[in-house]
């Protein structure tokens, strides 16, 4: 057959026809768990027929009897293989020439062989040559790029990444080897991605990485594995998780708590120590939770300012002076003896309100309006921290003030309201301004309306840029009596499409500590 030009043309035509049928398509591996209730010819054929009816374009079948029955029952091209457990070789897939013969006689259009560089009874090149001699398509199951090159040099028609992760002595990886797919895609041969493709997303990623087709097995035809995945997920979720040790460090007070989900199991409050970042400062905060050691495995800190990786720094030094490039997570981790996640307090509060509060599951922006103005953004179930850790920091946006451009929080925060009151001849803090407005003082109401107007313009711009489903307002100023009504009134001067759905926060002052604990328990774990 090898020497006949007519036969060579026929084989080449068959190769082109089959690879064209498989290009950009799904191949289903119908290989039951050994000795399972489905480990019989009838079940394999049933799997194959169901796969074909559901749109699969190829089948991967183990065992000559299964191949023969499937080839009779299905119109799809069959990749055939025989698995053996050998005493003197780790190679399992089609290790002998007689295996190749049996698969060809059974009707396999493609014969798969282990082409890894390991001790074996028959060289891979001989197996590939025998497949070609018998007029079938040779598929080489490899684990490395070098093995793929060697298989192609030996005449393989198709490369499969089947063996990646299965030839070493370490644990089998959880995810498929997309890097190997990308490297092998540059070799120019027909490439089938195979091995641990357990979700539609992973199969799609394989095609985008350069695969011509994808084999999926366990996720479709091994109910024992699928049941185990769901069982583990359900039982894991049902187990009470260890609480997270969470801190919310502010300019004036620090809260420590043990948190599980949205439940604060225990809490303690102290005045934030002076000398931010010093050894005594770290020690004082860590001592707040000293007798909780052993009750948590992770810790998390919500802080004002900018958090970029593990570095904490000031966005507005007037709010809290922080040493330059301070590695808060590393310092607190050493003091606590546990891994520590650090996140901006407003971003943590945004996550808390999205998971458990006023904006459950919605695309949202959270704004805390208190002594300063901070914010956080959650879109598509993901907290958006930004390239520099400042996403949502609306208070730092420059706006036009009486004497030039200033930060928004200079005009619309608690500090800003108190400053405007002082300039109008009325000493006191933001709380006293709200009290005066409630008592009918016109000067106080004008200051609050000015602050609400500045905030409304910024919020309308935020709606245009992010377009969230809602904007949640929290913080001492934001939640003060009457302020949200003033904000909504000020937004009335903007077009309807620019007016966001303004929602009051539900978690109050606990949003940050609940959010940062949940991030440590779920998002970063």
From Swiss-Prot:
CDD domains: NanE (cd04729)
Region (ManNAc-6-P epimerase) residue spans: 1-241
Keyword S-adenosyl-L-methionine: no
Region (ManNAc kinase): 242-525
Keyword annotations from UniProtKB, A to Z: ATP-binding, Carbohydrate metabolism, Isomerase, Kinase, Multifunctional enzyme, Nucleotide-binding, Transferase
A Pfam family of this chain: ROK
Associated pathway: Amino-sugar metabolism; N-acetylneuraminate degradation; D-fructose 6-phosphate from N-acetylneuraminate: step 2/5; Amino-sugar metabolism; N-acetylneuraminate degradation; D-fructose 6-phosphate from N-acetylneuraminate: step 3/5
Listed EC numbers: 5.1.3.9, 2.7.1.60
Record flagged with keyword Nucleotide-binding: yes
Any one of the GO CC terms: cytosol
GO molecular function, one term: ATP binding
Record: residues binding ATP: 246-253, 372-379
GO biological process: N-acetylmannosamine catabolic process; N-acetylneuraminate catabolic process
Reactions that this protein is recorded to catalyse: an N-acyl-D-glucosamine 6-phosphate = an N-acyl-D-mannosamine 6-phosphate; an N-acyl-D-mannosamine + ATP = an N-acyl-D-mannosamine 6-phosphate + ADP + H(+)
Biological function: Converts N-acetylmannosamine-6-phosphate (ManNAc-6-P) to N-acetylglucosamine-6-phosphate (GlcNAc-6-P). Catalyzes the phosphorylation of N-acetylmannosamine (ManNAc) to ManNAc-6-P.
Membership in a protein family: In the N-terminal section; belongs to the NanE family. In the C-terminal section; belongs to the ROK (NagC/XylR) family. NanK subfamily.
UniProt-recorded name of the protein: Bifunctional enzyme NanE/NanK
The organism of origin for this protein: Brucella suis biovar 1 (strain 1330)
Lineage: Bacteria, Pseudomonadati, Pseudomonadota, Alphaproteobacteria, Hyphomicrobiales
Gene name as annotated: nanEK
């Amino acid at each position: 057959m090898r020497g006949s030009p007519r036969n060579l043309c026929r084989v080449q035509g068959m190769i082109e026809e089959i690879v064209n049928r498989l290009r950009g398509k799904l191949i289903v591996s119908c290989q039951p768990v050994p000795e399972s209730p489905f480990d019989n010819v009838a079940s394999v054929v049933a799997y194959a027929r169901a796969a074909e009816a559901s749109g699969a374009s190829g089948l991967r079948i183990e065992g000559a009897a299964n191949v023969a029955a499937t080839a009779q029952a299905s119109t799809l091209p069959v990749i055939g293989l025989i698995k053996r457990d050998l005493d003197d070789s780790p190679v399992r897939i089609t290790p002998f020439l007689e295996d190749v013969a049996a698969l060809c006689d059974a009707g396999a259009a493609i014969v798969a062989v282990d082409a890894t560089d390991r001790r074996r009874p028959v060289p891979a090149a001989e197996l590939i040559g025998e497949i070609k001699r018998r007029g079938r398509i040779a598929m080489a199951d490899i684990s490395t790029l070098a093995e793929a090159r060697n298989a192609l040099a030996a005449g393989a028609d198709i490369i499969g990444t089947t063996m990646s992760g299965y030839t070493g002595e370490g644990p089998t990886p959880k995810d498929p080897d997309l890097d190997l797919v990308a490297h092998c895609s540059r070799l120019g041969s027909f490439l089938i991605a195979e091995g641990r493709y357990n979700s539609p997303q992973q199969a799609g990623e394989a095609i985008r990485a350069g695969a011509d087709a994808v084999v999926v097995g366990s996720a479709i035809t091994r109910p024992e594995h699928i049941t185990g995945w769901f069982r583990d997920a359900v039982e894991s979720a049902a187990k009470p998780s260890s609480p997270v040790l969470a801190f919310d460090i502010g300019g004036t007070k620090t809260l420590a708590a043990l948190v599980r989900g949205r439940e604060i199991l225990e809490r303690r409050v102290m005045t934030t120590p002076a000398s931010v970042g010093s050894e005594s400062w770290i020690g004082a905060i860590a001592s707040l939770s000293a007798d909780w050691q052993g009750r948590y495995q992770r810790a998390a800190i919500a802080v004002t300012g900018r958090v970029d990786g593990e570095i904490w720094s000031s966005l507005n030094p007037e709010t809290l002076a922080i040493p330059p490039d301070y590695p808060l997570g590393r310092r607190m981790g050493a003091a606590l003896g546990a891994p520590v996640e650090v996140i901006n307090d407003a971003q943590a509060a945004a996550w808390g309100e999205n998971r458990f509060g006023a904006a459950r599951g919605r695309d949202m922006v959270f704004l805390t309006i208190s002594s300063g103005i901070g914010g956080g953004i959650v879109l598509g179930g993901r907290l958006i921290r930004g390239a520099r850790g400042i996403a949502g920091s609306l208070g730092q946006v420059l706006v036009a003030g009486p004497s030039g451009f200033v930060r928004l929080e200079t005009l619309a925060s608690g500090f800003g309201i108190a400053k405007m009151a002082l300039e109008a001849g009325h000493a006191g803090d933001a709380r006293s301004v709200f009290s005066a407005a409630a008592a009918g003082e016109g000067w106080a109401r004008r200051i609050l309306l000015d602050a609400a107007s500045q905030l409304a313009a910024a919020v309308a711009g935020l709606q245009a840029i992010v377009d969230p489903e809602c904007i949640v307002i929290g913080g001492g100023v934001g939640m003060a009596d009457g302020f949200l009504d003033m904000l909504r009134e000020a937004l009335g001067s903007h077009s309807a499409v620019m007016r966001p759905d303004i929602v009051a926060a539900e978690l109050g002052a606990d949003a940050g500590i609940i959010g940062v604990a949940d991030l440590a328990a779920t998002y970063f774990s």
